Amino acid sequence: MSDIKKVVLAYSGGLDTSVILKWLQDEYQCEVVTFTADIGQGEEVEPARQKAVSLGIKPENIFIEDLREEFVRDFVYPMFRANTIYEGEYLLGTSIARPLIAKRQIEIANQVGADAVSHGATGKGNDQVRFELGYYALKPDVKVIAPWREWDLLSREKLLAYAETHGIDISKKKNGGSPYSMDANLLHISYEGTVLEDPAQEPEEDMWLWSVSPENAPDQAEYVELEYRKGDIVAVNGQALSPAGVLTELNRLGNKHGIGRLDIVENRYVGMKSRGCYETPGGTIMLKAHRAIESITLDREVAHLKDELMPKYAQLIYTGYWWSPERAMLQQMIDASQATVNGWVRLKLYKGNVIVVGRESKTDSLFDPTIATFDEDGGAYNHADAAGFIRLNALRMRIAANARNKRG
C-alpha cells in the first residue's frame, strides 16, 4: 500500500492518460481526481468526463475547465511581449502551455486535499521537466507520480494491450487516426514521431491539419490591421477582441493563407535532438507585427537589450522555468518596456508570408520624419556633427592600428 491517498491527474481522456488513470488506481490504491484543461486544442473536452466516469471516477472528482482566456492573457501575451523564439525558429507553443496546467493542477490539489499530482509525459521528453518544475515551484512538498518512469508499458502495443485487458475504450485508436504524436492548443499544433524521426524525410501534406499549403493558399493577398495597447493586441481590423479572440481570429487568417508551418530539429533539455513539425499561424503573425510596432516605439538601446535578453527568456520557458525568480525578474523588465508600445500595424498575408506594410503610433512614436528625411530638414540634423562622432568611435581602432604598425 502506498502512503499516497489522493492524486490529481492531468487528464486528456486519450489512451495514455486513461491507462495512467487505471494504473494509478491499481498500483497506488489511491483516489484519483482528473483535471482536463481546455486551452484551445480544438477538440471536445467533455468526452473526458464520460471516460473518467466509466473508469470509476466520482463526478465531484472530475474537473474540466475552459482556460483559453487565461492561457492567452497570462502566458501567451507576456511571452510575445518579449518576441520570444527558441533556437531562432520555435515559438514555444507546447512549452508555454505547461505552466498553466501545472498551476491549475496544484490549485486543485490544494482544494481537494490531494497529496500527489501525476502527468502523462514520457521519460524522454521535455514535458516531464516542465510539469514537475512547476509543481515543485508552487507546492514544494508535493509528491509527483510519473508513470512513464515507473511502469513497463513502454510501447504503444503494450498500452493497447493493457487498455483491452482493463476494459478501457480504445475504439478511436483502433479505428485509425493520425499516426503522429500531436499536441495542440490555441497557439499551435505539433507533430512528432513515425516518419518524422528521419530528419531527411519530408512530411506528407496530409499531416498538416490546420493550414492550407502556401501553394494552395489564395492568389489574392489579404490585409489585416492590428491595434496594440502596452504591447498587447486589443483589436483586429477595428474590432475589439479578448486575448483568446485575437488569437482565434489570427489563426483563422493564418491558416487560410498557409502561414506558420515549421519543420525543425531542436535541442531538447534532456540532451537529445528531436525533429518536430509545427503550425503556429496566429503566433507567426503576432511576432512579425509586434516587432513592427516596437520598431517605432522603443528606444534603440531598449530594443537591443530586449533582443539580447530574449534567448535566455526563451530558454527558461522551453526548459520549464516559467515559475522561477529569474523569469519573473525578466518579465518585469520586458513588461516595463511595453508601456509605450501603442499604435497599429498593417500586414499583408500572402501564400505563407507575413509582410509589414504600415505601422503608426500617434502617442509614442520615436520616428521623426523631419530628422529621418532625405530631403532638406531645415537644420534639424547637423551633418557636421557626424565627423566628431565618427572620430571618437574610431579612436580605439586607430590606437590598435598604430600599435600593430609599431610591432611591424
Swiss-Prot record:
Q: What class of enzyme is it?
A: ligase
Q: Which Pfam families match?
A: Arginosuc_syn_C (PF20979), Arginosuc_synth (PF00764)
Q: Where does L-citrulline bind?
A: 90, 95, 126, 130, 181, 190, 266, 278
Q: What is its main location?
A: cytoplasm
Enzyme Commission number: 6.3.4.5
Which UniProt keyword terms apply here? Amino-acid biosynthesis, Arginine biosynthesis, ATP-binding, Cytoplasm, Ligase, Nucleotide-binding
> What quaternary structure, including any partners, is listed in this protein's UniProt entry?
Homotetramer.
Quote the protein name from its UniProt record. Answer: Argininosuccinate synthase
Q: Which organism is it from?
A: Chromobacterium violaceum (strain ATCC 12472 / DSM 30191 / JCM 1249 / CCUG 213 / NBRC 12614 / NCIMB 9131 / NCTC 9757 / MK)
Whichever gene encodes this chain, its name is argG
